[in-house]
Amino acid sequence: MLNRPRCWVIRRFASQHAYQKTLNLPQTKFANRSNLQRTVNELIPESCDKIYKSQLQEFLSKIEELGDDSNAKLKLVEENLFVLQDGPPYANGDLHYGHALNKILKDIINRYQLSQGKYIFYKPGWDCHGLPIEMKALKQFNPDQLGKVSPVKIRAMASNHARKAIKLQKEQFGKFAIMTDWDKPYVTMESEYEINQLRVFLKLVSRGLIKRQNKPVYWGTETRTALAEGELEYNENHKSKAAYVEFPLTKDSCSKLFESANITPVADVSLLIWTTTPWTLFSNRAICFNEKYEYQLLRDNNNGGNYVVVESNLAEKLEFLINYQKVAAVSGSALSRLQYTNPLLGDRVERPLLHGDHVTNSAGTGLVHTAPGHGFDDYNVAHNHKVEVVSPVDAAGRFKLEELPPHLHELLTEHQTGLPRLVLEPSTAKVILDMLQKMGMLCSSHDYTHSYPYDWRSKKPVIIRATPQWFADLHDVKGDAIESLEKVKFYPDRGNARLSSFIKNRNEWCISRQRSWGVPIPAFYKKDDPDVTLMTEETVAHVIQVIREKGIDAWFKFDDSNMADWLPPRYKNEANSYYRGKDTMDVWFDSGTAWNELKDFYLKELKLKQLPTYLADVYLEGSDQHRGWFQSSTLTRVAYSGKPVAPFKTLITHGFTLDENGIKMSKSIGNVISPDAIIQGDKTRGLPALGVDGLRYLVAQSNFTADVAAGPVIMNHVAEALKKFRLAFRFLLGNLQKATFQKISYDQLRPIDKYTLYKLQELQITARTFYNENNFSKVLTAVQYHMSNDLSALYFDISKDSLYSDALDSFKRQQIQTVLLQILLSYTAIIGPILPTLVQEVWNALPLKWLGEEEHQKLTVFRTWPHYDIPESAKNSFANCELRLLDEFQRQFDTLEKSITKPVQTVTRIRSSECPLPYNEDELADILRTARVEIISGGVPEETETEISLPNGTKLHMLVRPSELSKCPRCWKHNSSQEDTLCSRCNDTIHNKA
């Protein structure tokens, strides 16, 4: 007796599963999870290298077929080729998430363009010169060896470091599924690239744009080189020791000032200035005022009745002047005839007061201490008035004592080391302020927190220092550069104003660097007078030819034995009176001329005789490149061509990478997430293994125009989303294996099939719109919504009964499989640009019979989007009728007794006054997922039937009730005449199989 219930359960279980083998259950080799080893070894080569090379070779073949028809070639390029220019990453260290963000965004764009019928040219690059790599090379030497290491040795070690970094980064990039040819990158330290760069420089020389001047430049004291504005970052919380300092007017100037003020006292007058850089006071050579302002003479009643001069509005705001008495006011122009002295220098030189438009009355005193060697505005005013430029500071940021008066030497020497003081040391500011106090020049001092430029590499504050440097004159270039941007499409739009403002505010570009690792500035200097330089169009062209023959390292072998080789023949007799310069070009000039790679591709490989209007369709980099690569690319291209045309048609920018707390990823903070940690996971940090597709999904789902966050929470959401994609594809592929492989025409499809295809068509239109807007996150959102609502919750669920239980050759099953194939084709097309290895895995699992081997192979490479032309009526008809019925069915089903848990346990009656009702009972049963539908035409509705009014005026009545029949042990629909007996449909299916 005790065993009977158990036996009954076993018998019941056996009954329910006795027919499982007769069902057409999904079968596919498509895995539940991705396999990283297979992805890297098989799927990436198939979906990246093979595709890129195949499509490019097809394009090159089409070009070759056109022979010498240059116009036809140009037309083919402009209409059919899509070019995205790679901004070269720096060849130093491992890749971080920012690299993945950048490269994957580019790849998504390229793949989408390929799917729209374009051919793709995308050549990856590496930026190899510059200070960080040189510093890595120098670290291999002991400090006492550094002064003895030759430039050639430094360059060899730097080159070796860069090559190792490129090899490492290439391997890491290879896991991102980027569609390109990694064996053919451009590298800025390769000979041909350097020659091309020098040719651009030659063009700028020929246009008179390259000049040498002793001007103030930003200077990195740690790195000991000049810096461009793009190499700076600003510390908003920098602290300086600020001081209000008095400079005495000469006796004669005091008299003139009193005369202008119409007073006749006998007293000294000082000019009150404010500075945040007391160390520059030794370089003071003028004081600037603004002739538009009014200035007050204030008497210090506590100091013998002497006077100070301050701008009128600011005089009211300076608290330490509270005991000073206003005596008179004079116009700014009254100061123009005056002179003063600088007691710090211990001389009696009378120095000028000069008008300056840069002088404001928003801070300070309205009188500006002017040191032409340490300030840009200072230099400009001094240059216009022929005031000397001095900068007694060396490359390390120490005072040059030999250029300062002897009485200052002891004060400005460190007692412990005996070295000149560092100008930025707080102790230096203290001794200077103490000296000012003793001399009676210090009126007040205070700590001042403000924004200050830092070297972006060393993270140390910079100074402004006048040194002889080479500059590109931008006065005649920036107008064309700004005009060129008017024709460029920016995404996001704000990028236009940002890039334009950077160019507009730039009059020159300091392109020389005092380093060994870089492309040389091909200038020659007189041995007996280094201020005399030789660099003409002729000499630069000759140097380029010599470098092509001897190699670029030959320039850096600084001996006199072969100077005649480096200069044109007409300089043979005087060649030995010159020596070669040691300066190298700013690395932004290196990478900024990367458009040469495209120029060579068009002219040399495609053999075009005319370049397309825009060399690249897209430039895409981080938002910081408005100051860097975007700017240098625009300036060099416009300066070279002499035309207001940028090298890019569209410019796209992305943000920085943050952790989930909104904090910028930083090694020092310890919140950096590497691409490898995203791909393989990191259990110690709670990071799930997302694989290659997960890394790409993480990038695509972000709003990349703002800063992009990554972390455990976001990554777990990505893992769930990927799981849903794989489940959807498993369903599609699993139900496309057992088939007759017959595709049914559209006219023969059911309303639910046509509705599903229309919704698929809608999805494609939506996705294409978002792709064209570079809004990849919305592409994914649209696909996920469609997958959840139109597939999983509707079509997939509706189709399962027929797919699993109908005969393999049933017409309805063929109808469904036809639609499933279209869903698969559309989904792989839509998400292919974002998840290429997932799509490749799907393609590999799809039976060839559905497409034919030739068609399958072509779609594998080009993956064009399916074309649909389905009328809107297909959607409206189904939505207005069948979906209305489904809503009412669900409402009534929810009110049934608790023992009724599945729609297959119910029967649905639909009554219509129309005769006949234009609906098929079997189709409605599938849609409602009920055991069966009974359609009744005419008759009086029962009270239990609910009225439904359709938009076309038809009135229906519906009743959902429990089925009185038994459960079929095969399909589980309650359509069997008795327990454990097959329903008629399943009985016929099995009988026909047999």
What residue spans do the PLM features occupy?
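N-terminal, positively charged nucleic-acid-binding surface of large information/translation enzymes
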Residues: A14-G304, A371-N384, E388-E403, M439-A481, ...
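Residues immediately within or flanking Cys/His clusters that coordinate Zn2+
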Residues: V217, L433, Y452, L965-C968, ...
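Acidic, turn-prone loop/beta-hairpin segments
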Residues: D127, T221, A228-E236, A739-I765, ...
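Core structural elements
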Residues: F173, N196, W509, A700-S702, ...
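Structured ligand/cofactor/substrate-binding pocket environments in proteins
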Residues: T39, G98-R111, K118, W126-D127, ...
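N-terminal mitochondrial targeting presequence
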Residues: M1-A18
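Short cysteine-rich clusters marking metal-coordination/redox-active sites
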Residues: G220, D455, K526, P568-N573, ...
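C-terminal low-complexity, glycine/proline- and small-hydrophobic-enriched intrinsically disordered tails
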Residues: N716, A845-A994
